[in-house]
Amino acid sequence: MVAVAAAAATEARLRGSTTATAAPAGRKGRQHRPCTATGAWRPGPRARLCLPRVLSRALPPPPLLPLLFSLLLLPLPREAEAAAVAAAVSGSAAAEAKECDRPCVNGGRCNPGTGQCVCPTGWVGEQCQHCGGRFRLTGSSGFVTDGPGNYKYKTKCTWLIEGQPNRIMRLRFNHFATECSWDHLYVYDGDSIYAPLIAAFSGLIVPERDGNETAPEVTVTSGYALLHFFSDAAYNLTGFNITYNFDMCPNNCSGRGECKSSNSSSAVECECSENWKGESCDIPHCTDNCGFPHRGICNASDTRGCSCFPHWQGPGCSIPVPANQSFWTREEYSDLKLPRASHKAVVNGNIMWVVGGYMFNHSDYSMVLAYDLTSREWLPLNHSVNSVVVRYGHSLALHKDKIYMYGGKIDSTGNVTNELRVFHIHNESWVLLTPKAKDQYAVVGHSAHIVTLASGRVVMLVIFGHCPLYGYISVVQEYDLEKNTWSILHTQGALVQGGYGHSSVYDDRTKALYVHGGYKAFSANKYRLADDLYRYDVDTQMWTILKDSRFFRYLHTAVIVSGTMLVFGGNTHNDTSMSHGAKCFSSDFMAYDIACDRWSVLPRPELHHDVNRFGHSAVLYNSTMYVFGGFNSLLLSDVLVFTSEQCDAHRSEAACVAAGPGIRCLWDTQSSRCTSWELATEEQAEKLKSECFSKRTLDHDRCDQHTDCYSCTANTNDCHWCNDHCVPVNHSCTEGQISIAKYESCPKDNPMYYCNKKTSCRSCALDQNCQWEPRNQECIALPENICGNGWHLVGNSCLKITTAKENYDNAKLSCRNHNAFLASLTSQKKVEFVLKQLRLMQSSQSMSKLTLTPWVGLRKINVSYWCWEDMSPFTNSLLQWMPSEPSDAGFCGILSEPSTRGLKAATCINPLNGSVCERPANHSAKQCRTPCALRTACGECTSSSSECMWCSNMKQCVDSNAYVASFPFGQCMEWYTMSSCPPENCSGYCTCSHCLEQPGCGWCTDPSNTGKGKCIEGSYKGPVKMPSQASAGNVYPQPLLNSSMCLEDSRYNWSFIHCPACQCNGHSKCINQSICEKCEDLTTGKHCETCISGFYGDPTNGGKCQPCKCNGHASLCNTNTGKCFCTTKGVKGDECQLCEVENRYQGNPLKGTCYYTLLIDYQFTFSLSQEDDRYYTAINFVATPDEQNRDLDMFINASKNFNLNITWATSFPAGTQTGEEVPVVSKTNIKEYKDSFSNEKFDFRNHPNITFFVYVSNFTWPIKIQIAFSQHSNFMDLVQFFVTFFSCFLSLLLVAAVVWKIKQSCWASRRREQLLREMQQMASRPFASVNVALETDEEPPDLIGGSIKTVPKPIALEPCFGNKAAVLSVFVRLPRGLGGIPPPGQSGLAVASALVDISQQMPIVYKEKSGAVRNRKQQPPAQPGTCI
């Protein structure tokens, strides 16, 4: 048993030591102290997944390596503790030991007491399978991994590799797979994140060759390397496996040489095999001996190797001049000022000018570079080229030895600029232009081209881009070089969607721009890459949608070679919730045939190097494409050269026509030679287009993607518009729908088409017909009839232009008839709308003969003062007076020249054609929230919703749909959303564990041996001082090591990898280095990290605890926030300072308590059983009698014992405010109580507001309480009884009479209906005629044959149901007078009927005798029936 206890104690100490010294990363759901904050989830759908098999990670290291690795990371336990653990495992506790369900990895061990893995410092997870802290590696070689399997969501891990100063270290990335653009591994050449950044790895980086020669490798020269990994809350992948070595040749000599020690130093270097050169033997050298002696000669001193003879070129001088096939070459340069991305380049003569770009470090930065394309060398430039602040994502355009640079993101501030600067090539100087009208968007990720229009004007067209204030821009901005003015063009054709990082080229033959791809937002919360291809005609300002490439990408490049647009590289990652293998960095090579509207995929470069990249530049010189720089986790400085095949290399028509893809050649029959697309005649070009048109294949499924008439009819896929949807041209519209096949036939300015193209609130608000819907984060069209028929919504006003001829006063009266007034054109929107409408009305056929000069609400008030109808003064900015205007004769204003915005002063009584009316709109435009880019603090950025994201290290707030566009190169190390913000700097973290979660922070422990310390920005060597820009004197200040902030001589201790063992937060001394001896200062806990019961505060790092402030209604409160756990039901508030008025509690808890108001003659039940009720020990009630002449009875019972006190006062305020309560009852430890309060004893009549107070206390949770107050009469009130009795009796009688009357009416109605049915039934009986022979005494006996004096026969026999009875009817002769005549007024005959039995009746047979006279034959004597 002793061994078991010792083992348990040792285990507890080990766990405590691990907890105290570890620096685990923040995890999902973890709650930090108030002084810290955790990251938030990224918006959007997320799902966990595994990488496809083709991306399976490399094999794990041998079993010995993890063991050695864990030994390097973990301090060995003391021998006594190790012995105790061994005794515990092998002793009697072994019978109760639990085995872990899964094996522990990375040095973790199974705790036999809990069956869970105990992880070493830096590892987390059920199996210790995830990294989650900081590691320090000191071996001369080793590996870095996030652990087996997929890495953990929302994690931060840091590795410090420590070597010898200035010793070269190489990191080799054998396997790497993270979420592109979101999960990054940063590599610093030093011992902190303040050291130079040399790589930011993200995405899928898998060697593409069996020889593993293209695996990324990073070289560190300082002797230290810091690797920091951050993953967000989206999906996770297999992570990484990185090996490092201090004595290793670069890239293992690429497998083409041997690694040998250098003679001059202890370093190693490659001894390359034949035909290979370079530091890592990765440059082909004199392949095929350069074709000597026919094609070239090998030059051993030249790194390129071959010196080709005339008419030969390419690798090994194997390709003739002109080239009959395309080929790639690569030029590598090591100058530190060269690597960059998102720069721009133009060609002037034979010089490629490279301007701007993003760089990791700016110590050797150069704003402008010049590259000689002939000699392929970088040229020196004057220092004046660096006078401009560094930027990236800008645009460049060349015109007459001047380079125009517009927009871009300023790297030092993170702001997007709208500066327009010109670089003069001849003197290498910059000039800032100040355009007259600053009506342009500040954009980044756009493109620009300077073109000469058909009118002769030279303009710079700026295409798309992203603006932090207005989102993704879909318009074309135009800068007039001669007028020095900006304007936003109103384009025609398809409604295109603008984006960030597209490519664009200008084709001089077609006078059009071709724009491909980009990162686009289709609404505020829907964003992705695009594969669209647009054509923009610069003269007609017409957009056309061409065939898409089916290859989604952004930050790629494009050039035009002989009628073909070549597209190279880019970021192709388009996954948001799971990985489909799309790579961050691409070397895809595609060609688009302009004449045939056809895409082709070209072979990727075969250069023995990983040439995948994005953010590079590409220019064209002598039909050769030069690709420079870019980003592939590293910033690149090489130049890729693509030489395309030449048309004039083909000698036959068949070879000429078959050339490509990647080039368009035409056969000239007159000269019998092959010419390029640029030299073709118009007839040859049209012939080629017609041939392509006949062979084209249409993708009818693409028609469904167009949601507006303009895009449906302005594309090359043969679609037509059917009322509200787009269908292929071979599909007919349904009945009743109108087919529109041409763009010109589409209804113009329909807001239903273009509003949903706007991706931000501000861009939506610019259009008066659109409205931003904040809930769905989308722009919608306003209803068409919001202003009424004939009226148009412009801003917050409704405008209407009439054509009636009338004077000013009559025009004003006509407007008033519509609750309007003459328009005050005081805004740009109103002016542009009125002028546009006037031009349309004037150009229409119905009004071609009528000249409109409409009245506007502008009048002269005095000699020189003009003002609008809304009393605002007239300014000459939006509308101008015509020459020699205003004249003295006119006092009212008219629009005379809509094309020139001209005004005239006219005589008010003269009738003129037209007037402009204005009235307020019923619609009020919703105000947009502050744009994310203008929010300067994290709390402001993340407070409202998930539309903004805060980047903590960059101190920037960006739109959620623009995160990738804002930080394309991993600049943001951690982001936050939805009201989760970190401290502004390291000093805001109160504990060592939280401090070391931040990669730029370290912990300085004071000498008190209590665990108290402070979090400071620092490195492994010690604290650093963060300089301000003003004191540093440059744009990019660097932190400096400052050991005085944590002096070891003063017994301060600096911790950067692990926290100190003593973590008592300054409230206790440590014994055995890690155990808190006795927590003082009202603290408790293993590390004295919480306040004792009844006190609250943050005692971490020396914080204070203070008593709970509960106004006497609680003794306990939340130890962190101080929120009181109120003990009286009905009292609420953080300090128990309020009553639950909404639940019928009243009172003043600051001076007394709260009472529940009871109603008389009602029973109340209170069930205090919820978790929120666990702290209640008391509840109070108050009741006031309703009747002054009746006694008040009360009873109370409960499910548990309680104490009861009852008092009374003359009124409620008298009892609660002045304390005039009189005790009545005091009981303890009871479950039930009943009592009655006499109205005479307590004098209810003289105390009409008498109040009884009931105090129930000292009960335990849970409990159920029932209470009631009632007032009942003591004797019978006879008058009241009889009044009540007779009232009820008479009421009952009245009800009975009414019911009887209703019954009678119903019965009479039913009787009438029954009689009517009987009459109808009798009327519908069958009938027939009978012959009746009447005998008279005078008749001769021979007239009737036979004897008629027989038994009478019936005239009718009506059988009853069952045929056993019948109604028999016979004629009866009544008595007659003399002569056989009945008396006057009487009938001689009567019909008699009787009910007879016919069950025994025999049938009567009738026979006919031959002859003309019928006679009835004598029948056997039988009765026809018997009466019943």
Curated annotation (Swiss-Prot):
Propeptide, residue positions? 23-82
In alphabetical order, the GO MF annotations are: carbohydrate binding; signaling receptor activity
Its chief place of residence is membrane
> Which positions fall inside the EGF-like domain?
100-128
State the disulfide connectivity.
C100-C110, C104-C117, C119-C128, C131-C157, C249-C259, C253-C270, C272-C281, C815-C917, C1062-C1070, C1064-C1076, C1079-C1088, C1091-C1105, C1108-C1117, C1110-C1124, C1126-C1136, C1139-C1154
Entry annotated with the keyword DNA damage: no
- Cytoplasmic topology: which positions? 1300-1428
Post-translational modifications: Heavily glycosylated.
- Every copy of the C-type lectin domain together lies at 794-918
Which residues does the entry place in the Extracellular compartment? 83-1278
Annotated region Disordered: the residues are 15-38
Q: In what residue span(s) does the PSI domain sit?
A: 702-747, 754-793, 931-982, 985-1060
Indicate yes or no for the key word Ion transport.
no
Superkingdom per UniProt? Eukaryota
Keywords from the named record: Cell membrane, Disulfide bond, EGF-like domain, Glycoprotein, Inflammatory response, Kelch repeat, Laminin EGF-like domain, Lectin, Membrane, Receptor, Repeat, Signal, Transmembrane, Transmembrane helix
SUPFAM superfamilies referenced in this protein's UniProt entry, alphabetically: C-type lectin-like, EGF/Laminin, Galactose oxidase, central domain, Spermadhesin, CUB domain
UniProt Kelch repeat ranges: 351-401, 402-450, 460-507, 512-563, 565-623, 624-670
* All copies of domain Laminin EGF-like, residue ranges: 1062-1107, 1108-1156
A biological process (GO) of this protein is: pigmentation
Q: Where does the CUB domain start and stop, copy by copy? A: 131-247
Q: Which PANTHER family match?
A: ATTRACTIN, LEUCINE-ZIPPER-LIKE TRANSCRIPTIONAL REGULATOR 1
Tell me the subunit arrangement: Monomer and homotrimer.
Question: What is the recorded name of this protein?
Answer: Attractin
